[in-house]
A protein has these predicted regions:
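Glycine-rich FAD pyrophosphate-binding loop
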Residues: 37-57
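Dinucleotide-binding Rossmann-like beta1-alpha1 core, especially the glycine-rich loop
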Residues: 61-139, 256-259, 266-279, 283-304
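Beta1/beta-strand and adjacent pyrophosphate-binding region of the FAD-binding site
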Residues: 12-28, 44
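Helical element adjacent to the flavin cofactor pocket in flavoenzyme catalytic cores
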Residues: 151-209
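Flavin (FAD/FMN) cofactor-binding core of flavoprotein oxidoreductases
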Residues: 134-138, 304-314, 319-397, 427-431
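Short beta-strand to alpha-helix junction loop
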Residues: 74-77, 103-113, 151-170, 180, ...
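Flavin-dependent oxidoreductases
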Residues: 31, 188-316, 328-339, 344-355, ...
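C-terminal lid/capping helical subdomain adjacent to the catalytic/cofactor pocket in oxidative enzymes
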Residues: 2-18, 39, 130, 365, ...
Length: 442
């Protein structure tokens, strides 16, 4: 079941030529298109389904610096500023509010890791506070659990996934971006060894630069052009509750439940580090690369072989551009939610917060997260194909840092001074044989 999502209209006419084509209408692609157009570039955004239809509307809606890997902290910090700027520019509410993020733990070892992280973050201008049990009780007087400590970052925020990407798309369109939904990119044409056009199901767009922000579909698109991009797919579950008392105005994370206050008075609810790994021929191909990641996360993961496994074997990784592509057979990935996770999270939430005893699950949904082996995204040119750029593999972090990731991608595409140092996000690290392991601290 797909979660609620504000829908936008498409531009009917496909341009014959633009400066940049952006493939993918999630938060990253829309943000990149917005920043490219603001710099005066002509931009067409093509999306096989509808804007925000996949993970950008299925995530938790957290916009956080807290707990980010060192490599992502600069991007997360810039993203919060850009959320405000882009929301104001759009003139449409994306639901962004700076309401803080709070983590709680029952583990002394985990608390110690948070203290170490807070010290590193402080050096990078992110100010988080380690909380004592007494301070937690003061913040959450109705919570009946016993905690050894917490971590709070008041400058962090939240946004509404159902509203955010459509709002950003409205801002992008205001600056001249054309948006084409139900328009799958089938592949790239090249001239003289560099990108010269994008072939879509509705026609060809000539261009000298293409940014692929295709999320779970990015690896398959790259393989069609002989480009290696190790991406694993994890199906995750979230839900929304009926309205209830405001036990937090922002986001709260524990081992037993994670919540975000919604504008409708309910909560977005989920369990962290839980999901189902979708086994695929590509994942077996990259099994050695992903092995350290699997060992790190295996306690929260299930393994599944679905019909897509066999479909990929039959389909292969090559197709003709004059016939329907794999991207046209599944317009929107809509995995079923794991209701055992939903029920466990709700039971834990109510047990720890009795004042929420009357809330119920209003809706649950699944989504597919595109994960890299080190859980750091790829925002980078592809050296093997000049004119081709990637902004993908956000590993469940993309929504919150989306505005800054899009800005960085736009900077890289145009050769501008980058928003932050892009070295950590290089495509090269994915294919040069180095050992990749998760760097997210918690």
């Amino acid at each position: 079941m797909s979660p609620p999502l504000n829908r936008i209209n498409s531009d009917e006419r496909l341009p014959a030529q633009v400066d940049v084509v952006v493939i993918g209408g999630g938060v990253i692609g829309v943000s990149a298109a917005y920043h490219l157009a603001k710099k005066g570039h002509s931009v067409a955004l093509v999306e096989k389904g509808h804007v925000g239809g996949e993970q950008s509307s299925r995530n938790w809606g957290w916009c956080r610096q807290q707990g980010r890997a060192r490599e992502e902290i600069p991007l997360a910090r810039e993203a919060l500023r850009l959320w405000e700027d882009m929301q104001n520019d759009a003139g449409v509410d994306a639901g962004f509010r700076r309401t803080g993020v709070l983590f709680l733990t029952k583990s002394k070892d985990e608390l110690a890791s948070w203290e170490r992280w807070a010290a590193v973050a402080r050096e990078m201008q992110v100010h988080s506070t380690v909380l004592t049990p007494a301070e937690i009780a003061e913040r959450m007087p109705g919570n009946t659990d016993t905690w050894v400590g917490g971590l709070h970052t008041p400058s962090d925020g939240r946004a509404e996934p159902s509203m955010a990407v459509p709002a950003l798309a409205a801002a992008a369109r205001k600056h001249g971006v054309t948006i084409h939904q139900g328009c799958a990119a089938r592949g790239l044409e090249t001239t003289g060894g560099r990108v010269s056009a994008v072939v879509t199901e509705k026609g060809t767009i000539r261009t000298q630069a293409v940014l692929l922000s295709g999320g779970a579909w990015s690896s398959l698109f790259c393989r069609r052009h002989g480009i290696e991009l190790p991406i694993g797919l994890v199906n995750a579950t979230a839900c929304r509750t009926t309205p209830g008392p405001e036990i937090t105005s922002g986001a709260l994370g524990t081992d037993f439940y994670c919540i975000r206050r919604r504008l409708d008075g309910g909560f977005t609810l989920a369990l962290r580090n839980r999901g189902t790994v979708e086994l695929s021929p590509d994942l077996f191909r990259y099994a050695r690369t992903f092995w350290p990641t699997y060992l790190h996360r295996k306690n929260g993961l299930k393994l599944s072989i679905g019909t897509s496994f066999f479909e990929q074997i039959v389909r292969g990784t090559s197709w003709s551009f004059d016939k329907p592509s794999p991207f046209e057979t599944e317009r929107v990935r809509d995995p079923a939610p794991d209701m055992s996770l939903v029920n466990a999270a709700l039971a834990s939430l109510i047990k720890a917060n009795p004042e929420l005893k009357d809330i119920e699950i209003a809706e649950a949904w699944g989504g597919t997260i595109d994960c890299t082996p080190d859980t750091i995204p790829v925002i980078s040119p592809v050296d093997a194909l000049p004119g081709f750029f990637l902004a993908t593999g956000f590993s469940g972090h993309g929504f919150g840092i989306g505005p800054a990731a899009g800005k960085l991608a736009a900077d890289i595409v145009t050769g501008a001074t980058p928003l932050v140092d892009p070295a950590a996000y290089s495509h090269k690290r994915m294919i040069d044989g180095r050992r990749l392991a998760p760097v997210s601290p918690f």
